[in-house]
Amino acid sequence: MASGKIWTVRDRYGNDIYLSAERWRHVIDPDNHPEMMPYLDAVAATVQQGRRRQDVYDPNSYQYYHPFLDLPDKNSHVVVCVRFRWSIAADGSMNEEKFVTTAYFQVF
């Protein structure tokens, strides 16, 4: 994991999206969503198989959501927030990043 990426998966729309170790630490931090710790595979599955909706306030952010039967506290879905970011490198080429920012449970 030299790049700091835990995994990279392709969503149903053809986007390669990654989860970094830093973002996963953020998700499972005791002040955020520590209940997500055993659900790393569900986070990946949500990005791969889930539906998504664009954030109302940030058109470069999306929420992916997918139902699971075994979630705690009557939750029905895993929600994964993903950011799309583009920049231009010094050589003029386009850099593209699509990465998980956070994840949590929700009742739909």
Residue spans for each PLM region:
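Ribonuclease/tRNase effector modules and their secretory precursors
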Residues: 1-108
